[in-house]
């Protein structure tokens, strides 16, 4: 199951889940995805159960990307203990999910929309929140997270060169003010 290798602090406060996901809300790797419709916590066990359900249905056909990671520790006190005497020990890990967050992605040459939809439906049953199936439109490509395409890098270089040319041509003379 998923859990961080090491963390700065062992315990966290529970926190609140307000608003919608502004990051991780677009398809980045595959053609099909499962998107959260409401907020909640998803445990590492639920993520693993969903992953197994999808891979069992897809078999060897395509590729599955897990877009969430359980990085929040949830503490629990032992049963039948009295109040007080500090916070309990970390028992399991959860991923904090906001509406709009992409949970899983699926893609590959052998994956059709019907196969992906059924695999995601099986994964939905393992999750404690409402989700929906989304697919890329025809001709649309996934936005690669953290990877800039060579075309976009070329456009950035051209923009930077044109800005430096404009700056050198417009800064013909410099006036100094003496006091």
UniProtKB/Swiss-Prot annotation:
CDD domains xref list: Ribosomal_L16_L10e (cd01433)
Compositionally skewed regions (Acidic residues) per UniProt: 156-168
GO terms (BP aspect): translation
SUPFAM superfamilies assigned to the protein according to its UniProt record, in alphabetical order: Ribosomal protein L16p/L10e
Ranges where the record places region Disordered: 147-179
Keyword Ribonucleoprotein: yes
GO MF term (any one): rRNA binding
PROSITE patterns listed in its UniProt record: RIBOSOMAL_L16_1, RIBOSOMAL_L16_2
Keyword terms: Ribonucleoprotein, Ribosomal protein, RNA-binding, rRNA-binding, tRNA-binding
GO cellular component: ribonucleoprotein complex; ribosome
Biased segments, Polar residues type: 169-179
Family: Belongs to the universal ribosomal protein uL16 family.
Known role: Binds 23S rRNA and is also seen to make contacts with the A and possibly P site tRNAs.
Subunit note: Part of the 50S ribosomal subunit.
UniProt xrefs under HAMAP family: Ribosomal_uL16
Protein name in the entry: Large ribosomal subunit protein uL16
Originating species: Prochlorococcus marinus (strain MIT 9211)
């Amino acid at each position: 199951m998923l859990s961080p290798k090491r963390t700065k602090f062992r315990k966290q406060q529970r926190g609140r889940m307000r608003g919608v996901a502004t990051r991780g809300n677009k398809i980045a790797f595959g053609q099909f995805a499962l998107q959260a419709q409401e907020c909640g916590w998803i445990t590492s066990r639920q993520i693993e159960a969903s992953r197994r359900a999808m891979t069992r249905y897809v078999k060897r056909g395509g590729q599955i990307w897990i877009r969430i990671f359980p990085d929040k520790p949830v503490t629990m006190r032992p049963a039948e203990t009295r109040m007080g005497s500090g916070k309990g020990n970390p028992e399991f890990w959860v991923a904090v999910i906001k509406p709009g967050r992409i949970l899983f992605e699926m893609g590959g040459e052998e994956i059709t929309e019907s196969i992906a939809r059924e695999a995601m439906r099986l994964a939905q049953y393992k999750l404690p929140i409402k989700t929906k199936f989304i697919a890329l439109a025809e001709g649309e490509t996934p936005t690669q997270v953290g990877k800039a395409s060579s075309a976009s890098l070329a456009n950035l270089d051209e923009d930077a060169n044109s800005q430096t040319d404009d700056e050198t041509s417009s800064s013909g003379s410099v006036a100094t003010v003496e006091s």
